[in-house]
């Protein structure tokens, strides 16, 4: 007879929180270490948002509440839209100026 495993028996809330804090720390480290390249900054911010989503889903499972998972889906959707718009703006800027360095973007004039 096949036994259906309950994932909460093997993976506790602490495991999810440790994973989330590690992903957030990697994102924060990437944000501070790669301040020159805007693509790396966007990827680091996405990692930090992913860590927040892991927290939402973990607490949603722990509390047996569906709202955390719904918030996570909404956050992922909005983050994907923001990233696509940001990359489109960067692509147009790169075509015009030839560089996407932070120092060059700070010197933009009307």
Swiss-Prot record:
NCBIfam families in the record: PRK05715.1-2, PRK05715.1-3, PRK05715.1-5
Gene Ontology cellular-component annotations: NADH dehydrogenase complex; plasma membrane
GO biological process, one term: ATP synthesis coupled electron transport
Entry's EC annotation: 7.1.1.-
MF GO annotations: NADH:ubiquinone reductase (non-electrogenic) activity; quinone binding
Membrane topology (UniProt): Multi-pass membrane protein
Species for this entry: Rickettsia conorii (strain ATCC VR-613 / Malish 7)
Keyword match Chloroplast: no
Top-level taxon of the source organism: Bacteria
Catalytic activity as recorded in UniProt: a quinone + NADH + 5 H(+)(in) = a quinol + NAD(+) + 4 H(+)(out)
Binding partners and assembly: NDH-1 is composed of 14 different subunits. Subunits NuoA, H, J, K, L, M, N constitute the membrane sector of the complex.
Segments passing through the bilayer: 13-33, 41-61, 73-93
Family: Belongs to the complex I subunit 4L family.
Name listed for the protein in its UniProt record: NADH-quinone oxidoreductase subunit K
HAMAP family: NDH1_NuoK
Name of the gene this protein is made from: nuoK
Biological function: NDH-1 shuttles electrons from NADH, via FMN and iron-sulfur (Fe-S) centers, to quinones in the respiratory chain. The immediate electron acceptor for the enzyme in this species is believed to be ubiquinone. Couples the redox reaction to proton translocation (for every two electrons transferred, four hydrogen ions are translocated across the cytoplasmic membrane), and thus conserves the redox energy in a proton gradient.
């Amino acid at each position: 007879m096949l036994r259906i495993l309950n994932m909460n028996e093997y993976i506790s809330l602490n495991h999810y929180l440790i994973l989330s804090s590690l992903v957030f720390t990697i994102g924060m480290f990437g944000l501070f270490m790669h301040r020159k390249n805007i693509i790396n900054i966007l990827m680091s911010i996405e990692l930090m948002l992913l860590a927040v989503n892991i927290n939402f889903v973990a607490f949603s499972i722990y509390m047996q509440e569906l709202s955390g998972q719904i918030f996570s889906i909404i956050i992922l959707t909005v983050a994907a839209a923001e990233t696509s718009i940001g990359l489109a703006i960067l692509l147009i800027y790169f075509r015009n100026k030839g560089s996407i360095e932070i120092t060059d973007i700070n010197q933009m004039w009307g």
